[in-house]
Amino acid sequence: MFESKINPLWQSFILAVQEEVKPALGCTEPISLALAAAAAAAELDGTVERIDAWVSPNLMKNGMGVTVPGTGMVGLPIAAALGALGGDAKAGLEVLKDASAKAVADAKAMLAAGHVAVMLQEPCNDILFSRAKVYSGDSWACVTIVGDHTNIVRIETDKGVVFTQADNAQEEEKTSPLGVLSHTSLEEILAFVNAVPFDAIRFILDAARLNGALSQEGLRGSWGLHIGSTLAKQCDRGLLAKDLSTAILIRTSAASDARMGGATLPAMSNSGSGNQGITATVPVMVVAEHVGADDERLARALMLSHLSAIYIHHQLPRLSALCAATTAAMGAAAGMAWLIDGRYDTIAMAISSMIGDVSGMICDGASNSCAMKVSTSASAAWKAVLMALDDTAVTGNEGIVAHNVEQSIANLCSLACRSMQQTDKQIIEIMASKAH
């Protein structure tokens, strides 16, 4: 519709956001296994009686302690069972959105009978790997997902191979929207946000709608660690100021509370993560309301936030030892700074200060405590913006921060890609020892 007005680079930016910013019901690592199980079950005519599943260490890490929506249970086995018995394989990250109460009961019964086994895939060279093999009588079907939460690479049944993905991913990556985005810069992203027609990016307002609803639910209910609602009570007790900084903290953490606590509402995700989507969205929403921004300004700020978050995260492994709420909050810092003064220098300084502040935060698996890290990252983003508005930032003379924001980002991502690989192994070992 907008091709005549939008150059190819901008089209790639829009497509990158449409690929990476999607609704997702439930934490995306268990959901990836649920999708594999649902897709496998769809290949069978009979009722699924048994499930064997294999996942990568990183997916195991992020699936051990998180609640699966609608079940009140945590972990990968219930996700696999519910995916097979009540999932919609065509719904992607919303695979469990229509799961019935009967499907939940049947899934719990399957677990109780010991008919679901989830194991580590060994050896495994893939950071994100999930495979589900489901059985019905003498028939079976097996689906493998690799690299991305919904990227099905192989479907096989007892009758033979149904589907296998062509092995040209590296060549396609260079020309994909994400590949194009990764070779641009924050300055080019800002130029796009300032000039793109509003109608071409209006869709990003859905992020505010979905994640705003999660935030409201988090404040209403007692989800997860209920950080948001607890801090709201402290405001009423006079222990926290009722100001913009506190509103950012409370509303962002409340959305993550609901998300990780198993609320049956979808999050608008970013880079395959609901918490990253929440972090890139809610702080920007709160500041937009504070400054009286209309829908167009909100959409531009959200587009800057989400695109910046994707741009940074694409330089990282899909899953790693680095808590990616921090990189999503760098996007939020860009969006909030843009709403207040719109200058590139302010945005760059805010991101540099973020890298100097929260870059060491580890990911120790998806759980209710993610809301703590989301709230910390959101608060750090606002602090960095406030500093940048006064032309103050962590400089290239300090730590891993460079004199150029692009190099600062590269320095951060090199830590996650290299040095933190051993950290990741140690985290997984510690978590595995707790499980026994």
From Swiss-Prot:
Q: Which InterPro entries match?
A: Ser_deHydtase-like_asu, UPF0597
Cross-referenced Pfam families: SDH_alpha
Question: What are the protein's GO molecular function terms?
Answer: L-cysteine desulfhydrase activity
Example of a GO biological process term: L-cysteine catabolic process to pyruvate
- Highest taxon above the source species: Bacteria
Which HAMAP family does this UniProt record tie to the protein? UPF0597
Family membership noted in the UniProt record: Belongs to the UPF0597 family.
Q: What is this protein called?
A: UPF0597 protein YhaM
Task: Name the gene that codes for it.
Answer: yhaM
